[in-house]
Every structure is written in C-alpha cells, then in structure tokens.
C-alpha cells in the first residue's frame, strides 16, 4: 500500500465533513499505478455518484463522465488557461486539437469565436463534446471532428487551410525515460503543423 493510499479514508472523511458531497468516486486507475506496483481502483467511496455530472467553469456548462471519462473526466488544472483564451478568440476561427470533452473549444465559442473546430481521435470524446456544445447552445458555432490530430494538421497544411487561433493540448507523449526522444519528435511535429 502506498502512503497516499493509507490516508485515503482520512481524506474522504474530511471531504464529507467539510464539503458535504452527494458522493465521492475514486479513479485510481491510471496505468502508472501498475508500474509502481499499486492496485488500480475505481468505485464509489461515499454516497451516490451519477454516471454524468454537470459542472460550470467560467460560465461554460459541461457534462462530465466521472466513471468512464479519461482520468477524472475533466482536467481542472487547465481552468486558468481556458479563461486566458478569451481575448484571443473573439470573432476568430479556432482549431482545438486533442479536444477531449471540448473544454477549450467550448470556451472559445462562449468567448465569441466565429467558428470552432474541435478534433479528437476518440468517437466517445467527440460525441460527449457535441453534447456539451448543445448544452451551451453553441452547436452552430462549435463542431467536433473525429480524427487523428497529426493527420488532420498535415492534411490541412497541404490544403492551405488556415485558422486564426490553434489550441494544442495533447496528452502526455511519454510515461517513461526511454520514450523521451519520440515524445520530443511528436511535440515538434504538432507545433510545426499548427
């Protein structure tokens, strides 16, 4: 057992006492836990947790799939970055690569972008992001395309397609030291194509 795991129940108890949540759901299922010899765990730790939760960030509404979504279903660490795009997107065409739930794309639409295209390789992510666009009344401004962002960027570059703003928020390309060089090439490629 990891020291962090040994304090898990203390954290749950503190959250219940201070925050009074409807439920707490554990997502200790990232692959790196296996590398560290830790068990991958998911499940309700307290109360009840619906399949989807609606949240609001910077005035934008999102459905979040806590149980099946990537990692926790929403990347809260990018909140300030999503807010920071506001002065750059009004009246602009925007491409959001690796869109996941559409968080950057929907913020761009909310902040007045003329047209937004979100790209993700996952059909599930694109469907979920499309639902989020409808939830915000942005379905006529924000659209999602299921595609490999590397391939799409290359195709659009060859075709001369241009966007006023390109957002790149890729997943981690490496989890191990041995893959660092390949990751560098990947990051360089997407930045050159953008």
Question: What is the predicted role of each segment?
Answer:
Residues 1-6:
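Conserved small/polar residues in nucleotide/adenosyl-binding loops
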Residues 7-74:
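Non-catalytic substrate-recognition/targeting regions of SAM-dependent transferases
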Residues 47-194:
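Rossmann-like S-adenosyl-L-methionine
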């Amino acid at each position: 057992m990891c020291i962090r795991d040994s304090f898990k129940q203390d954290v749950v108890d503190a959250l219940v006492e201070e925050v009074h949540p409807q439920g707490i759901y554990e997502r200790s299922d990232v692959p790196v836990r296996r590398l560290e010899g830790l068990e991958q765990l998911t499940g309700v730790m307290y109360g009840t947790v619906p399949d989807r939760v609606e949240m609001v960030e910077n005035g934008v509404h999102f459905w979040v799939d806590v149980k099946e979504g990537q990692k926790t279903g929403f990347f809260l660490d990018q909140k300030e970055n999503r807010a920071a795009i506001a002065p750059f997107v009004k009246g602009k065409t925007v491409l959001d690569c690796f869109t996941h739930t559409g968080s950057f794309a929907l913020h761009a639409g909310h902040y007045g972008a003329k047209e937004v295209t979100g790209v993700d390789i996952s059909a599930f992510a694109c469907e979920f992001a499309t639902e989020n666009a409808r939830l915000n009344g942005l379905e006529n401004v924000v659209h999602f395309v299921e595609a490999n962002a590397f391939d799409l960027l290359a195709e659009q570059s060859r075709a001369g397609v241009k966007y006023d703003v390109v957002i790149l928020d890729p997943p981690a390309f490496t989890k191990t030291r041995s893959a660092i060089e390949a990751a560098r090439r990947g990051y360089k490629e997407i930045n050159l194509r953008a």
